[in-house]
Structure formats: structure tokens, C-alpha cells
Amino acid sequence: MGNSAARSDFEWVYSDQPHTQRRKEMLAKYPSIKALMRPDPNIKWTVLGMVLVQVLACWLVRGLSWRWLLFWAYAFGGCINHSLTLAIHDISHNTAFGTRCASRNRWFAVFANLPIGLPYATSFKKYHVDHHRYLGGDGLDVDIPTDFEGWFFCTPARKLLWLVLQPFFYSLRPLYVNPKAVTRMEILNALVQLAFNVTIFALWGIKAIVYLLASSLLGLGLHPISGHFVAEHYMFLKGHETYSYYGPLNWITFNVGYHVEHHDFPSIPGCYLPLVRMIAPEYYDHLPQHHSWVKVLWDFVFEDSLGPYSRVKRKCKLAKDQL
């Protein structure tokens, strides 16, 4: 468990991200893809159902022992809350109500945020725009680990700890890498979340709150679904910085596994991404892909060639306009 990862720096490149050029080529060749840039008609009802399920779970766990509460938080609540974060990811691209109803999308993301226990949705959108525009951008893409993470989490034991602590790194890293002013919507997100938490505590006590928070921290940490964090952009094969996964866990994660397709067409909802691959298979079938998120986690921990440094990084010029 003591072997150090082989890399001592990121994979620096001097080319633009591949998604921009591929998007232009595909739209020229298959203009019908534009028809997929429309709202997901089902995401509203799916999210509503998941939020209500977690509220019901708060009532059910109020009398459980702490041991069983944490078990169900990992095995059940972790799946629901992680799935909700991926719904928020999809909604951040205005897929619930369309681009003409940006405010509705923002508030619906705040609603989807409720069972997560901590205000997250608005801040996520603020930084996720940069992740797409400046993929791998030094000091801009906060999805890239810090130099400290790459240096310190370099052995199997430390990489395992890094996976457990993923929720904390994803929350705190933006404040260090690319701090931005707090927005009015972020404050409103926090106030709504606080009101929800106080209501849950008043109704069913501290165990309900612990269940929600544990569902988020455990579900976003060392959990099978969390394999997507590593699978999406960590360089398992030199020269490739984005990877897709086409397995069954897409059914509960809003097709986040179709990640190459997503970066090619961020405005297409997850529910339609399989159609992109069907329309233009020659752009995707030859690319390296993952077949198991659990195996991704295993390989990340035990392969010396993999670690937090296994990311493509580039210098990016700031764009004048905003997405």
C-alpha cells in the first residue's frame, strides 16, 4: 500500500480542448442533432419523486439506531442524493425548463438541492460553466485537483483517503483555485436550505438531519456511483482527456456516463445523449471508454500510473462573453 504514483505533475498540453471542433464538425454533418437541444420532459417529475422519497426517509429513520441509519444513508440515501447532484448538473444547463426560462431552472435546482442538506446548486452552476468553457484550464477549471492533492495523495492508501474525502475537495477547492464573489442567488439558496433543514429537524429530530448529510457525504465519497468523478476526465490513456461509460448506472445518474457526448453538446439533456451516439457513432465508438465505475475506482487506487495528477491541463485565455 506504500508505492507512490509515478506522475509528479499534470499532463500539460498546448492544444485546445477537442470538444469544440468535434461539435462544429458534427453539427455540419448532422444538423438534426440540433433538435435534441430541448428540455427533458421528465426530469421535473423524477426530481420531485426523489425529493419526496428522501423526505419520507427522514420520517422512517427517526427511530433507527445510529448503525442502521448510517447503513441506509450509504446504501439508499447515498444513491438518491448523488443522483440529485447529477440532476442539478443537468439542470445547470437549463434542461428542465429550457434556456428561455433560466430563472425557473435556477429555482428548480435549489429545490433539487433540499435533501442534500447543504446549499450547493447555485455555486455549482457558477463554476460548472468554466469547466465546460475552459476544460483543463489552469486556475479556471476547479474540477482539476490542486498541486497539493497531486503531491500528497500519491500512494494507494492516500488515494483511497482522497476518494473518501471527495465531497470536501469539491466543495473547498473552488475557494482556493478560483474564488468568486458570493451572489444573491447563492444567499437565497442558503436561506432556503436552512429553512428546509430547520423544518426537518423540528418535525423528526437530529437523526433525520444526520441521515440527509450522511447520505450526501457517504454517497459522494467512496461509493460505486462516485466512480464517475474519476472516470470522466482522469487520463487512463495518454492523449484522451474525456471518457464515456455506457453501463447500467446511467439509468440512475441522468446519463452522466455519456460524458464525451455531454461535453460535445452541453445543451442536450442527459436523456437524449444516447441519441447523439446513435446519430453519429463514428465519432464515439472508436474512443476509449469505461465499462465499470467500480473498476475505475480500483484502478485509480492501485495503479501507480494514476492519481490526482492524471489530468490534462492547459493555459486558457479568458473569453469575453459568458455561456
Curated annotation (Swiss-Prot):
Name the predominant localization: endoplasmic reticulum
Give the family, as the similarity comment puts it: Belongs to the fatty acid desaturase type 1 family. DEGS subfamily.
Keywords assigned by UniProt, alphabetized = Endoplasmic reticulum, Lipid biosynthesis, Lipid metabolism, Lipoprotein, Membrane, Myristate, Oxidoreductase, Transmembrane, Transmembrane helix
Record localization = Endoplasmic reticulum membrane
Top enzyme class, one word, equals oxidoreductase
What Pfam families has UniProt attached to this entry? FA_desaturase, Lipid_DES
Q: Where is this motif: Histidine box-1?
A: 89-93
Question: Per its database record, what is this protein's job?
Answer: Bifunctional enzyme which acts both as a sphingolipid delta(4)-desaturase and a sphingolipid C4-monooxygenase.
Per UniProt, what is the membrane topology? Multi-pass membrane protein
InterPro entries, per this entry?
Answer: DES1/DES2 (IPR011388), FA_desaturase_dom (IPR005804), Sphingolipid_d4-desaturase_N (IPR013866)
Q: Which GO terms are recorded in the biological process aspect for this UniProt protein? A: ceramide biosynthetic process; sphinganine metabolic process; sphingolipid biosynthetic process
Please state the pathway this protein functions in, per its UniProt record. Answer: Membrane lipid metabolism; sphingolipid biosynthesis
Query: What's an example of a GO molecular-function annotation for this chain?
Result: sphingolipid C4-monooxygenase activity
* Domain of life of the native organism: Eukaryota
Q: TM spans, by residue?
A: 41-61, 68-88, 200-220
The UniProt record lists the EC number as 1.14.18.5, 1.14.19.17
Q: Which cysteines are joined by disulfide bonds?
A: none
Q: Name one GO cellular component term.
A: endoplasmic reticulum membrane
Q: Kindly state the positions of the motif Histidine box-3 in this protein.
A: 259-263
Recorded hits in CDD domains, A to Z, give: Delta4-sphingolipid-FADS-like (cd03508)
Q: Which organism is it from?
A: Rattus norvegicus (Rat)
- What this protein is called in its record is Sphingolipid delta(4)-desaturase/C4-monooxygenase DES2
Q: Where is the lipid attached (N-myristoyl glycine)?
A: G2
